[in-house]
Amino acid sequence: MQLVIPMSGVGQRFRDKGYKLPKPFIEISGKPIVQHVVEMFPGIEEVLFIVNKEHFEDTELRIESRLTKVCSNAKISVIDSHKLGPSWAILQASKDINLNSPVVVNYCDFACTWDFPAFRDELESGIDGLIATYSGFHPHMLRNAQYAYLKINDSGNLIDIQEKLSFTSKPMLEPASSGTYGFGTGQILLDAITEQISTGDSYNNEYYSSLTYKSMIASGQVIKKFEIGKFFQWGTPEDFEDFKAQKDFFTYILYYVITQVLNPYFPY
């Protein structure tokens, strides 16, 4: 199985907020975001990072050494800078996609709790696609609920997917994509992306991996959803800063309870 992490965007929103490093390398809980991403996939055989040329050639950023530290045996595909989304990036790196094994495309700006071995088993069971999803309340949805949402039929198959808009007025009751997209083989992935770009399945001129499944649905391929546990969103500066503030608050509360409330009762 191959893990593909497109991280070739410009990251303008973080730049505008004064962040010096590209988003995947900003640290949270003592690790760069991209390391949290890779650690979601223990034991995966192949990892491919897709980075933009501008970042890669900036010697101050040290992109290659940073990525090697995260995953020493990963491939790094360097492509021209663009604003056309992850599917476009993957197509530019197509020579490094493993055509014959299952491929998981994972965005570079979140983490989650989940059962990766179970996800792997289901993707390897012969289906064409598998999308990791979450539902219910998650703190980032207080600010923004504009994510990719799935419509599933009674047989558990994906029949529609759309970006930045829920299908109903109650998005927390719908399956939302976390940003982990499985494809039965790399060939299935590349064929679907080629069709996606040919038909213009994009949002605001960006080719999202969620919308790659549109052509697969139309051709009758089998795509399922896989429910994860907790989802941690770091995609925008606001998401990132909210998470840090919430984590610091609850860490302080835990510290206070242990040191000020419980400690007097258990001095030894």
How does the language model describe each region?
Residues 19-24:
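Short alpha-helical oligomerization interface
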Residues 25, 150-152, 225:
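A structural signal for short hydrophobic beta-strand segments in well-ordered beta-sheet cores
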Residues 2-5, 13-15, 27, 31-105, ...:
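Conserved N-terminal catalytic core of the sugar/cofactor nucleotidyltransferase
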Residues 91-92, 118, 212, 242:
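Alpha-helical elements of Rossmann-like donor-binding domains used by nucleotide-donor carbohydrate transfer enzymes
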Residues 113-196:
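Conserved core of the sugar-phosphate nucleotidyltransferase
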Residues 107-111:
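The conserved acidic donor/metal-binding loop of glycosyltransferases
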Residues 3, 99, 174-268:
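Conserved alpha/beta core of the MobA/IspD/sugar-nucleotide pyrophosphorylase nucleotidyltransferase superfamily
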Residues 50-52, 77-81, 132, 164, ...:
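Conserved beta-strand termini and adjacent loop/short-helix elements that scaffold enzyme active sites
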